[in-house]
């Protein structure tokens, strides 16, 4: 067991949509354990993940020992992915990218072959083989990714979740890092700034600046300082600073600049950004535009923006008061008219009565 505890293996919690109940699951609930079998061509034998030096066109089979200490068979589904960089500037080895980076020539999923699933019998262990077929052309730098090992969800598990009324489950997986290289040629990291666009993170307005690592090498200890102004002006509207980030080889991520609850306003803006990594500095100054349609759409769904629809209720209230006043005025006018007519009738009646009295006296 001591050997297993020394493994540098990433535990990844895969969460589905939550509606009713969030359950807490820890590593002890996993029904299997893993141990990479480190081969002779490991660049550093002290590392407990795969960090292999190979040659172009070479083929090699590596193995991971899967141990099942439970009294039931366990079905494990392996998956291989190239490393990517998430929105927080952290390298992910077990996540599936929405879209492969344009500079990534060799995807690990195309280079490494593994079975779709493997059965590990109860109280036993199985060695899972993975075959690596290196590209024919030699490349500088590294290929980096991860081998995700997750237990297959059975129909019984699904039924139990349904009976318990759960809409969420914490599904954990082991992710073993895999790094491949062919030579020791020095690679100088290079970053590029791509699209700048308004978007949202967790239902909050941000302006995303897409940063891309176009080299086959990690960018370590990355710090970013960004500020946004109106085009042609100096007043800083939004700003963001981050340190200690890392980018995977040939990957990109959207660096979010928060608006801190402010409304997006249509117009022309300027982004000024500086990135630093181990003594190397990049600086960009780019103009971009936010159109009215995008601003309105995002403002409606930003949970931090105060609802300014109160004026509608105020308008309705004022309208009702005006209607009430108009109705009161009409009714008052009618009443006054009736009173005036009644007064005139009464005066006319008095006059007639008075005339009759005069005639009677004359007689």
Predicted regions and their residues:
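Short beta-strand elements of extracellular/lumenal beta-sandwich folds
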Residues: 52-72, 132, 201-214
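Membrane-proximal extracellular "stem/stalk" segments
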Residues: 184-315
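N-terminal edge beta-strand
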Residues: 30-59, 187-189, 198
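Cytoplasmic C-terminal tails of single-pass
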Residues: 337-363
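Intrinsically disordered, low-complexity Pro/Gly/Ser/Thr-rich segments with frequent PxxP/GP/PP motifs
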Residues: 98-138, 231-264
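A short tyrosine-centered beta-strand micro-motif
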Residues: 74, 143, 147, 267-275
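Short acidic, flexible loop segments centered on an aromatic residue
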Residues: 76-87, 92-101, 149-150, 216-232
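Short, solvent-exposed loop/turn segments enriched in Ser/Thr/Gly
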Residues: 46, 57-63, 126-128, 140-146, ...
